[in-house]
Amino acid sequence: MNYVNIENLSFSYDDKKIFSNVNMQIRKGDFISILSSNSSGKTTFLRLIKGLLNYNGTITVDDKEISIIKENICLLTSFTESYSKTILDELLLITNDIVKIKKILKDFDLYDEVNKSTQSLSYFDNQKLNIIKCILKNPKLILIDSIFSFLNKHEKLKIFSMIKKYQLELNLTIIYTTVNLEDILFSDSVYIINNKKISLISMEDLFTSKIIKDNHINIPVFYELKDKLKLYNLISDNVSIIDEMVDEICR
């Protein structure tokens, strides 16, 4: 059964059409990624779902208009707010369930920092705290807007792993936007923004050079190198890992 329904969504900004008759259906508990270039409308799309912008069309979550439940839709951005409160103080504003707080802090490796002021946290820890706060609010929908741009691969993997863990445990519905191909690995499905539309795309089609090139998507170095080596017939199509690539080149 569809949980998020978007029908004939259109939006313009200063007479410039950003989206035209977009239709999407997302199931409860799905983690979807929206992949496209910068300045393509990813952030605008999430702001529309959050109910922060006026639009033409219909957006419902759990059969309710977003104007009714927008306070129960969590939008995570790269912007981090710092207060003089400690991590524990921040979380106690959301719930008094100390057992739940303790568990999630341990999962995100923040338990030892519980009495630390949020002003002293790194960007990485601030983002972990924001995700924790979002999860504790038990939202109808979580929107994540390219928050991993300033994180290294280890930090990204840690956060993605925890988000996926709680998505599966709590049946969370998540929409994530990114320009990086490597960031979609935890997704249940992937969409592309192109020509004012948002379209579901298969993994097979996604990894074609044309789609990547047309949408100015940042690809992992492995795939970029693979395409160049294939161009000179140095490796075959079925190479999928670095070790296989090295073996074929050395033959």
Please annotate each region the language model reported.
Residues 4, 18-21:
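Conserved structural motif at the start of ABC-family nucleotide-binding domains
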Residues 35-37:
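The feature captures the beta-strand-to-loop junction immediately N-terminal to the Walker
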Residues 50:
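Helix-to-loop junction immediately C-terminal to a conserved catalytic motif
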Residues 57-70:
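Conserved ABC transporter NBD signature motif
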Residues 74, 79-89, 93, 117:
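Conserved catalytic motifs of ABC-family nucleotide-binding domains
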Residues 104-121:
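Conserved ABC nucleotide-binding domain
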Residues 197-222:
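Conserved beta-strand-loop-alpha-helix hinge in the C-terminal portion
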